Design a protein with these regions (language model features):
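Short, glycine/charged-enriched secondary-structure capping and boundary segments
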Residues: 23, 58-59, 87-89, 273-277
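Structured, acidic catalytic/metal-binding patches in enzyme active sites
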Residues: 33-236
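Short secondary-structure boundary/capping elements
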Residues: 25, 54, 240-244
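Short, low-structural-confidence N-terminal segments
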Residues: 20-39
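A cross-kingdom marker for long, charged
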Residues: 232-291
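Bacterial Sec-dependent N-terminal signal peptides
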Residues: 1-26
Length: 291
């Protein structure tokens, strides 16, 4: 169960912070959605999927927003039974493909040694995992803790507020995002992550710091160049999903005031959720960041 929770946290980390394309100047992770005929406002919150449990905070502003809404909508319905097992199963390659078959002997040895020496994990146990998902495991030691889950904390808060929980996507939807990127490109990213691991560790720490200060603009500037070598990655991992979510968010907000929570990387950019909602005619205002 521990490895399942760890990998789930790492898996969803990529969806939080991959290459947002434009900055939001306001320092806030919580946004109020109103106008365009909405009887009551909804709220949009940007999550991070790699955080030590003691750093996960449901703030007073978030509590107030949840009190003013009737349902919680996440990327995935984390309250659904068996979702972690489903995600683990879907993260594995099919038809007997393994990471060894995708790498040169030299790169495979590099990966095997890295897993053993730096992570204390045998590669054999994860050899069938899709390369890009395997690379997320490298991020975990930076925290020096067993990651907590903002999503599960929000689910717990929703239960306390007697709110229903729903998801914008299914596990199959999220895995399909990775499947749109060729395995060879994923493998190249995996090897690059190892060779540049010291730099990667610093970047992750900086991203977490920027998140904690709610500096979305600074976060954007830091990660804008990430994964640039992977063709169409930004569209597959971020923009296409935002566009798909927009009608769902609109319809849901019209039906009931809703607390939406998605990866923070989805908020910014010319095709980010905030901009898309504004272009659709809604008022989207930053809720003042709490100290």
């Amino acid at each position: 169960m521990k490895i399942t929770l760890t990998l789930l946290s790492a898996l969803t980390f990529l969806f939080s912070f991959i290459n947002p394309a434009h900055a939001q100047k306001e320092k806030s992770l919580l946004w109020k959605i109103s106008g365009k005929g909405l009887e009551k406002p909804s709220y949009l919150f940007g999550t991070i999927h790699l955080m030590c449990p003691q750093d996960i905070k449901i703030t007073e502003a978030m509590q107030s927003a949840m009190s003013a809404t009737e349902q919680l909508v996440l990327e995935l319905d984390m309250d659904e039974p068996g979702i972690m097992q489903e995600m683990m199963s879907a993260s594995m390659m099919k038809d007997g493909t393994t990471i060894k078959s995708l790498l040169s002997e030299e790169d495979y040895q590099l990966l095997e040694n890295f897993m053993k020496d730096s992570l204390g994990m045998p590669l054999q146990s994860l050899a069938g995992m899709k390369p890009m998902l395997l690379s997320t495991v490298f991020m975990l030691p930076v925290l020096q803790c067993q990651p907590g889950s903002y999503e599960m904390s929000l689910v717990q808060a929703a239960k306390e507020h007697e709110m229903e929980v729903f998801g914008l996507e299914t596990v199959a939807d999220q895995i399909a995002v990775f499947d749109a990127i060729p395995l060879k490109e994923q493998s190249a990213y995996l090897v690059k992550s190892i060779k540049e691991y010291d730099q990667t560790k610093h970047e992750i720490k900086d991203m977490i710091r920027l998140y904690q200060t709610q500096d979305v603009d600074g976060l954007y500037k830091m990660i804008n160049k990430s994964m640039a070598e992977m063709e169409n990655a930004e569209d597959a991992l971020l923009n296409d999903r935002n566009l798909k979510w927009l009608p769902q968010i609109e319809e849901t907000a019209k039906e009931k005031p809703t607390f939406f929570a998605v990866g923070a990387g989805h908020l910014a950019g010319p095709q980010g959720v905030i901009t898309l909602l504004r272009k659709a005619g809604y008022e989207v205002e930053a809720v003042k960041a709490e100290k």
